[in-house]
Amino acid sequence: MAITAGMVKELREMTGAGMMDCKKALSETNGDMDAAVEFLRKNGQAKAEKKAGRIAAEGIVKTVVKDDKVAAIVEVNSETDFVAKNDEFQGFVEAVANQVVDSEAADLDAFMAEAWEADTTKTVKDALVEKIAVIGENLNIRRFEKVAADNGVVVPYIHGGGRIGVLVVADTDVVNDEIKAALKNVAMQVAAMSPKYVSREEVSQDYLDHEKEILLAQAKKENPEKPENIIEKMIIRRLNKELKEICLLDQVYVQDSDLTVGKYVDKVAKENGANVKVTKFVRFETGEGIEKKVDDFAAEVAAQAGM
């Protein structure tokens, strides 16, 4: 069967694959469009396996919020910042985030095995593998989290075009623009200052005991002549200072250093006749904790050439 330019164009639009790849697929399958799509999928999977050894440490974080009540945050990684800014990649990440917000998956493995909402004949993993083939880089759906505000609101914040994403969950009996704007400011605080806990009540006794042990050793080394009662007071002061840095509500509010974040939230709540309590936050930063692989140039060229 003769392969026409129109057939190649149609297959390209269906799959996003390159022109020569589409022409080859149609030739190999005698012009059968469905078989050609399957041929490209199989070819894409082979390419994806070769690319899987490369480190995907760039990418973006995306958030999706439904009705101010349910939200999802996802991190999807690429190998390069160039691809992270690509519309094809960003559209895929948005589709992943939209699927997460509707998903009941308990973990990443379960999510990857779900039917892909855009084409239920595929799984999420299949969709990822196909996107790897189209984009030409190793991609990785690294993590996600879904949150719900049963008695309040969820507010998102994205910083740096997706480099950092934050969700803040709050219980509130008033939901208006002022309350949501204040919670967005809190989300910006989380992005900038990276707290570990909402409040001191969340800090475990094990963590406190561990920190006290470290601070005690430091204080004794720095002040060997001081009595135990003085050392104890020093430890308490240092621990309080540390807690003010790692607990969101105790942090100095970056937009007004006269207030803590907790006092800022209380101030806005009072102005709006509301009761507002921040109950949870989630912060994802692209690539955090991923060790980037460094190859010499010759090895990189050889790897990409399949040598």
Language-model regions: role of each:
Residues A2-M307:
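N-terminal assembly/interaction segments in proteins that build large macromolecular machines
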